[in-house]
Design a protein with these regions (language model features):
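PAPS-dependent sulfotransferase catalytic domain
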Residues: 45-106, 110-111, 115-118
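Short beta-strand segments
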Residues: 6-7, 26, 90-92
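PAPS-dependent sulfation machinery
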Residues: 1-23, 41-61, 65
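Conserved phosphate-donor/acceptor-positioning beta-strand/loop module used by diverse small-molecule
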Residues: 21-40
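A short catalytic or substrate-binding loop motif that flags glycine-/basic-rich loops and adjacent residues
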Residues: 17-19, 27, 71
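PAPS-dependent sulfotransferases, especially Golgi type II membrane carbohydrate sulfotransferases
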Residues: 42, 46, 62-65, 80-81, ...
Length: 180
């Protein structure tokens, strides 16, 4: 069994990426938030905490998101085509943020680890932050940026996200073994 971990920022090439792994642990994030995080990461010049001006988002956000939300969907569909349900564990990023222990237990169960709750909990509590963590946007800025999107783009993105996430959850180890 090939045991590799990779982090993929999606683009046109990754939608047709050939997966060469036996199993996958897939962290799924709302595409609107993922695209914003990716844009921040890509434009921050080695994590110097400079951000794109809000004017950039006002002028370019809608066409940029329309293109990338579709790529996000294609990439995730490609993942589903590449792995059988028992060989993919789907973790929703938003759920992970709210229920860290529960979601990480799903990961460890999928990977075959026998970790007791108190050991996992201590590890998580001691390592939640670090020098690698980028600073968060100022309060309310994400919602302001997302408000620049047209209603049509927002609805399209929400629909793609919900549909794709449900499809992933219904066709993965997550839904079969980890729900109860």
């Amino acid at each position: 069994m090939k045991n590799h971990i990779f982090k993929a920022y999606f683009n046109a090439k990754s939608a047709s990426f050939n997966f060469r792994y036996d199993r996958a642990l897939l962290l799924v994030r709302n595409p609107l938030h993922q695209i914003l995080a990716f844009t921040d990461w890509k434009t921050r010049n080695l994590h110097n905490n400079t951000r794109l001006p809000l004017k950039f988002y006002q002028d370019f956000l809608d066409p940029f998101f329309n293109k990338h939300v579709e790529l996000w969907q294609k990439w995730h569909e490609r993942v589903l085509e590449s792995f059988s349900a028992e060989n993919i564990c789907v973790i929703n990023y938003e759920d992970l943020r709210e229920n860290v222990l529960e979601e990480l237990q799903k990961c460890t169960q999928f990977l075959g680890f026998d970790i007791q709750n108190h050991i996992l909990q201590n590890c998580i509590l001691q390592n939640q932050t670090g020098h690698h963590k980028r600073t968060a946007r100022p309060f309310g800025e994400t919602q302001l940026i997302l408000s620049f999107l047209s209603k049509k783009t927002r609805l399209k993105s929400d629909e793609i996200y919900e549909k794709t996430l449900q499809k992933l959850l219904n066709n993965s180890y997550h839904s079969d073994k980890c729900m109860g």
